[in-house]
C-alpha cells in the first residue's frame, strides 16, 4: 500500500514547493523507493495548454499527451520517472468532472457541493495516481499559498485524506520563508508562525517545516520555530538559497528531510546513494570553457517560458564539460536591429517552439544567419517550421513561402495543417500531443547522434511539413533525417555541408535528464565547442585548411 506526502506553501508564492517535491522524490528514489509526484493547481483552466507563457511559463507535455504545469518537468528530471496526465490536476478539471457526473445522474439527484463532492473527486485523483503508478510513496504538491481562497478545496481534501489511509500513512510538509530584516539584522519567524496557524485552522498540523532563507538558520531559531509551530526541532529543515536547483536535494538531505519524512511514514531509512548526483552538481559548479548559445524566442522576457530548453542545454553542457553562457534574444528585436548585430560572436543558435506571427521574421533571419555563418543551429517544433520557410524563401526559389498558420492564403504553404486537424474547433488538448515514434535515416547526423533506428519523442503541434514540396527540398540539398514510421510525416531535417544544422518537429527538451542529456542538445554543444579558440577544429580553420564555401 502506498504512503502519501502532501507539500503546502506559505508566506509567499513561488517559494519552491515544486523543487522541494522533486528533491524529496530524488532522495526517496536514492533509497530504493518508487515515487510518483502530482501537482494540484488551483486555477479554473482545465489545463495550461491554452494559457499565455507570460502568465504560466512553459507547458510541459507528458508521454501520454497531457499539457501540464512546468513543475512536472522538474519531477521528471529529478526522479527520472515519467509522469502521466493523472499527475496534473486543476480546479477546472475537477469541476468539469463533477459537473459531467452530475449531468449523467451519477449523484442520484443529490445536491452537489464542494464538500463532499469536489473534495471527494480530488481525493479520488490522488488515489488513482497511487493505483496506476504502483509507487511506494506518492508526493502531492498543492499549488498556491495557504490562505488563498482558491486553494481551500484542495487543503480540505488533503485534510480529509487522513481518514482515508490513517495517520501513519501520510505526512504533511509545509514550505515557508524566513525573511531577513536588515535593520534588525535577523531572520524573522513570525510569518512562518502565522502561516502554520492558518494551516492549523484548516485542520492540518504539519509534520515537517522546510524553511527557505538566504542565510544559515541557527539551532536556537530552529528550536523557536519548532516550539511555536508544534514540530520537533529536528523536523525544521533549512533550505538555503542555492546556486543551482540541482544542489537542493543535497541540501535537504544534509538537513534531514528524507529521514524525517520516512520516520513519520514509518518506513525504513535505507542507505542513500547520491554519489552520481553529487558528482553531477560538482561538474555543474566546475565547468570547462563557456559556449555562447543564443536562444531566439518571442517570450524571452519570462525565462520560465523555455524552462525545459534551458535545462536541456545545461544537461548537455554538464556532459560536455562546458559552461553555458546563455543569451536571451528577442525575435522581434532581430527584425529591427538585424541578426548579425544580435548574434555575432555566438557559438550556437536555438530557435524553440511557439505559436503565431509575432517574431517569426526575426526567427527566420536568425536561422538564415546561422546557416550562412555556419554556426551550429537547433530548431524545435516551430523552430523546424521556420527553418523550412527560410530555406524555401532563400534557397528553393519560393520567396512567398510560409506556413498556413501564418498566412492561410499563401501560394506556397510549405508548412500546412495536419489532415486530422482539419475539422478541429476547440483549442485545448486537441493538438498532436504526446509520444510518437520517429524513424531515423541511416548515414545522417541524426543517425550519428541517436545511434538508433527508431526513437520516441514528445510532440505538441498542429502543422507539419507539406510533402508536396519534399522533392523540391531534397533536390535543393535538404536532408529529411527522420520521419514517422510510414514515412509520411517529416520529423527531422538537416543540412549537408554544415557543421551542425538540424531541426525537429518534436520537443526533445522534455526527455533530457541531468545525467542523460538529449542527443540533439549534446550534439549542439559539442559542435559549439568546436568553435572555441583552443579547439582542434578552430585551429585548423585559423591555419586556412578549412574554407567556408
Swiss-Prot record:
Q: Which residues bind UTP?
A: 13, 188-193, 224
Instruction: Describe the location of the Glutamine amidotransferase type-1 domain by residue ranges.
Output: 292-534
Modulation of this protein's activity = Allosterically activated by GTP, when glutamine is the substrate; GTP has no effect on the reaction when ammonia is the substrate. The allosteric effector GTP functions by stabilizing the protein conformation that binds the tetrahedral intermediate(s) formed during glutamine hydrolysis. Inhibited by the product CTP, via allosteric rather than competitive inhibition.
Pfam families per UniProt: CTP_synth_N, GATase
Which InterPro entries does the protein's record reference? Class_I_gatase-like (IPR029062), CTP_synthase (IPR004468), CTP_synthase_N (IPR017456), GATASE (IPR017926), GATase1_CTP_Synthase (IPR033828), P-loop_NTPase (IPR027417)
What are the protein's UniProt keywords? Answer: ATP-binding, Glutamine amidotransferase, Ligase, Magnesium, Metal-binding, Nucleotide-binding, Pyrimidine biosynthesis
Q: Which domain of life is it from?
A: Bacteria
Task: Provide the active-site residues from the annotation.
Answer: 381 (nucleophile), 507, 509
Q: What are the binding positions for CTP in this chain?
A: 13, 148-150, 188-193, 224
Reactions this protein catalyses:
UTP + L-glutamine + ATP + H2O = CTP + L-glutamate + ADP + phosphate + 2 H(+); L-glutamine + H2O = L-glutamate + NH4(+); UTP + NH4(+) + ATP = CTP + ADP + phosphate + 2 H(+)
Q: Per the UniProt record, which EC number(s) apply here?
A: 6.3.4.2
Subunit structure as annotated in this protein's UniProt entry: Homotetramer.
Known PANTHER family for this protein?
A: CTP SYNTHASE (PTHR11550), CTP SYNTHASE-RELATED (PTHR11550:SF0)
Q: Extra info from the record? A: CTPSs have evolved a hybrid strategy for distinguishing between UTP and CTP. The overlapping regions of the product feedback inhibitory and substrate sites recognize a common feature in both compounds, the triphosphate moiety. To differentiate isosteric substrate and product pyrimidine rings, an additional pocket far from the expected kinase/ligase catalytic site, specifically recognizes the cytosine and ribose portions of the product inhibitor.
Please report the name of this protein according to its UniProt entry.
CTP synthase
Q: Recall the taxonomic lineage recorded for the source organism.
A: Bacteria, Bacillati, Cyanobacteriota, Cyanophyceae, Synechococcales
In the UniProt record, what gene is named as encoding this protein?
A: pyrG
Amino acid at each position: 500500500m502506498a504512503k502519501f506526502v502532501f507539500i503546502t506553501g506559505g508566506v509567499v508564492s513561488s517559494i519552491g514547493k515544486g523543487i522541494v517535491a522533486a528533491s524529496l522524490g530524488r532522495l526517496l528514489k536514492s533509497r530504493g523507493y518508487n515515487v510518483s509526484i502530482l501537482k494540484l493547481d488551483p486555477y479554473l483552466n482545465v489545463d495550461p495548454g491554452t494559457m499565455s507563457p507570460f502568465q504560466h511559463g512553459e507547458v510541459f507535455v507528458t508521454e501520454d499527451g497531457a499539457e501540464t504545469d512546468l513543475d512536472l518537468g522538474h519531477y521528471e528530471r529529478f526522479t527520472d520517472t515519467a509522469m502521466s496526465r493523472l499527475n496534473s490536476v486543476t480546479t477546472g478539471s475537477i469541476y468539469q468532472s463533477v459537473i459531467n457526473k452530475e449531468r449523467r445522474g451519477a449523484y442520484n439527484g443529490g445536491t452537489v457541493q464542494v464538500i463532499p463532492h469536489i473534495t471527494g473527486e480530488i481525493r479520488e485523483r490522488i488515489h488513482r495516481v497511487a493505483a496506476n503508478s504502483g509507487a511506494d510513496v506518492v508526493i502531492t504538491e498543492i499549488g498556491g499559498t495557504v490562505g488563498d481562497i482558491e486553494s481551500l478545496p484542495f487543503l480540505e481534501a488533503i485534510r480529509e485524506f487522513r481518514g482515508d489511509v490513517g495517520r501513519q500513512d501520510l505526512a504533511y510538509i509545509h514550505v515557508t520563508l524566513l525573511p531577513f530584516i536588515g535593520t534588525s539584522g535577523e531572520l524573522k519567524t513570525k510569518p512562518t508562525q502565522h502561516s502554520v496557524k492558518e494551516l492549523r485552522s484548516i485542520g492540518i498540523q504539519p509534520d515537517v517545516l522546510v524553511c527557505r532563507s538566504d542565510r544559515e538558520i541557527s539551532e536556537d531559531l530552529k528550536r523557536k520555530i519548532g516550539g511555536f509551530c508544534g514540530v520537533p526541532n529536528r523536523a525544521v529543515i533549512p533550505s538555503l538559497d542555492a546556486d543551482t536547483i540541482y544542489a537542493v536535494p543535497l541540501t535537504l538531505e544534509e538537513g534531514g528531510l528524507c529521514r524525517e519524512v520516512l520516520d513519520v511514514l514509518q518506513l525504513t531509512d535505507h542507505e542513500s546513494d547520491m554519489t552520481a548526483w553529487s558528482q553531477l552538481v560538482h561538474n555543474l559548479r566546475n565547468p570547462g570553457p563557456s559556449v555562447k548559445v543564443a536562444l531566439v524566442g518571442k517570450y524571452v522576457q519570462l525565462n520560465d517560458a523555455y524552462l525545459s530548453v534551458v535545462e536541456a542545454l545545461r544537461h548537455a553542457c554538464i556532459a560536455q564539460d562546458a559552461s553555458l553562457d546563455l543569451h536571451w534574444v528577442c525575435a522581434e528585436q532581430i527584425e529591427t536591429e538585424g541578426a548579425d548585430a544580435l548574434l555575432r560572436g555566438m557559438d550556437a543558435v536555438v530557435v524553440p517552439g511557439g505559436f503565431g506571427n509575432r517574431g517569426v521574421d526575426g526567427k527566420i533571419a536568425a536561422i538564415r544567419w546561422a546557416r550562412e555563418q555556419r554556426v551550429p543551429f537547433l530548431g524545435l517544433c516551430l523552430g523546424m517550421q521556420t527553418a523550412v520557410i527560410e530555406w524555401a524563401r532563400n534557397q528553393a526559389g519560393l520567396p512567398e513561402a510560409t506556413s498556413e498558420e501564418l498566412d492561410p492564403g499563401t501560394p506556397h504553404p510549405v508548412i500546412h495543417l495536419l489532415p486530422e486537424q482539419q475539422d478541429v474547433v476547440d483549442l485545448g488538448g486537441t493538438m498532436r500531443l504526446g509520444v510518437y515514434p520517429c524513424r531515423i535515416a541511416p548515414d545522417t547526423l541524426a543517425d550519428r547522434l541517436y545511434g538508433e533506428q527508431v526513437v520516441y519523442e514528445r510532440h505538441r503541434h498542429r502543422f507539419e511539413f507539406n510533402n508536396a514540396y519534399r522533392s523540391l527540398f531534397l533536390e535543393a540539398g535538404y536532408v529529411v533525417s527522420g520521419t514517422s514510421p510510414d514515412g509520411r510525416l517529416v520529423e527531422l531535417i538537416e543540412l549537408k555541408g554544415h557543421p551542425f544544422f538540424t531541426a525537429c518537429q518534436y520537443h526533445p527538451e522534455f526527455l533530457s535528464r541531468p545525467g542523460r542529456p538529449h542527443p540533439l542538445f549534446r550534439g549542439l554543444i559539442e559542435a559549439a565547442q568546436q568553435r572555441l579558440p583552443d579547439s582542434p577544429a578552430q585551429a585548423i580553420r585559423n591555419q586556412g585548411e578549412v574554407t567556408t564555401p
